[in-house]
Amino acid sequence: IVDALHLIPLKVSAFLDLSRRRTAGETIDSNKINKHFRDVFRLYAMLIPSEKKDVFPLSIKSDMQQFIEAATALSAHLEDLGINTISQEDILRDLNRIYCSAD
């Protein structure tokens, strides 16, 4: 079973892959791209604070940095996901800390 901490990078990778393929001209349903994007935020809400410590490979750090950059221009509509105690900006900052920090 994959927990939220380790599923988030898979969703990020799927979002980036589908976004790149769509940009390259492939017909990709935007709903599929949006689903992976929003899933990252859904899964973030499921993280347990004690789970937030791990060492991730450079490929995951790179993907997460690209995701965070792309996500700053998009809205996850957190209220529709039942997330109303934290902002998207704070979630992105926390994702950066979790997946990209050198700790």
Where are these regions (language model features)?
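Long, low-complexity C-terminal extensions of enzymes
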Residues: 65-103
